[in-house]
Amino acid sequence: MAKGTNVFLRGQVSQDLETRETLYVGDPKLQTRKTMENIDLLLKEAGSCMDHVCRIVVYLVDIRYREEVYQEMGKWLKGVHPCSTGLVVPALARPDWLVEIEVTAVIPD
């Protein structure tokens, strides 16, 4: 069980965090990489890090993206085994988004 202050990140996507421009249209692997970069940055800004992710929810618009998305996520979560839920949904908020990832982490005591 994780102990500490909770950090809840809303669903993150492959967007430039400053311009809101969608990046890597049509490429689920690169969208996942950018999404994980955003998550890493936001967790660090909150005082946490990927090592303290305790829950992750992954939304995919196509089940065929699952393997490459999870392989890319695994590069960012080496040695971390959070509770995980994966969902296939008909669409995300913007048609160019192929994957959205939501995480909960802690700032350890």
Identify the meaning behind each predicted range.
Residues M1-D109:
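Short, polar/acidic, helix-capping and beta-turn segments at strand->helix junctions
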